[in-house]
Amino acid sequence: MGLDRRDPNPESRSTRLVLEQLAVMSSASTPVRIGLSGALGRMGHAIAGALDGRDEAKLVLALDRPGTEGRPFGALKLGVAADIARCDVAIDFSTAEASARLADIATERGAPALVIGSTGWTDAEDAQLRAAAAHVAIVRSGNFSLGVNVLAGLVEAAARRLAAADWDIEVFEAHHRRKVDAPSGTALMLGEAAARGRGAALADVEVRARDGITGPRPEGAIGFSVLRGGGIVGEHEVVFAAEEEVLTLKHSARDRGLFARGAVAAALWVAGRPPGLYDMMDVLGFRS
């Protein structure tokens, strides 16, 4: 029997292809200078690894929480947020509060463009980021995976075609025990996609908690169910349940490297873009 030469991780291969296409499209004669905020976290290390050895992008600045300045990070020492103006793009996976502050600093200095993967945004922090997007280009996404963004498109299409009177929508998500916000940014992104498909605002139809005697499920509700435990990288399911059949759309993440590669692809894409708030649907060309 011959060897099976199929890629065991086709999504990883697809993400690499997208990143390579973006690199070819780049007309820059010098590497895109990348700053990394949240460098000491799991995603920070994964992104640094994804940048290592790339010709079209170079890590020139690494940041983390106050008090870490001067600590070694690979060939660099951790710097301060005020230095981000010397970067072309800053990739930030920290907290929503820190991301909003970083956006303010970028606005004050007129640079750099931002790629933000932080989740758990308050309304005030979201407004702060949107105001900054009037001055700098920002890509924000609850998930930088190619597969999840395809899933969001499928969820929106299904919600548009499956009537709320007959089909209930529930978003399930599971993550490792160290994740501090719930529902996940990805779950909310999928909920937003479902709500768009039904022509509704998620805030008007979401149900995030159930306890005790809750009564019948409201028609058109989009529910969220959350699990935290162990080292789960990320599991997301969107269930469309009718009386006689159930449709389940699911994505499983096996390695943080796929998110890191997606973030690098977003950084290459957003470098030199006009101010505005973008997401991975823009980066991947899914939105005309």
Task: Locate each region found by the language model.
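Intrinsic-disorder-associated, low-complexity terminal segments enriched in Asp/Asn/His/Tyr and depleted
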Residues: 4-9
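C-terminal substrate-binding/catalytic lobe of Rossmann-fold NAD(P)-dependent oxidoreductases
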Residues: 33-84, 166-288
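Short, ordered loop/turn segments at secondary-structure junctions
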Residues: 65, 119-121, 143-144, 174-176
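N-terminal Rossmann-like NAD(P) cofactor-binding module of classical short-chain dehydrogenase/reductase
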Residues: 90-91, 115
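Short glycine-/small-residue-rich Rossmann-like dinucleotide-binding loops
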Residues: 94-95, 119, 228
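ADP-ribose/adenylate-binding Rossmann-like module
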Residues: 105-124
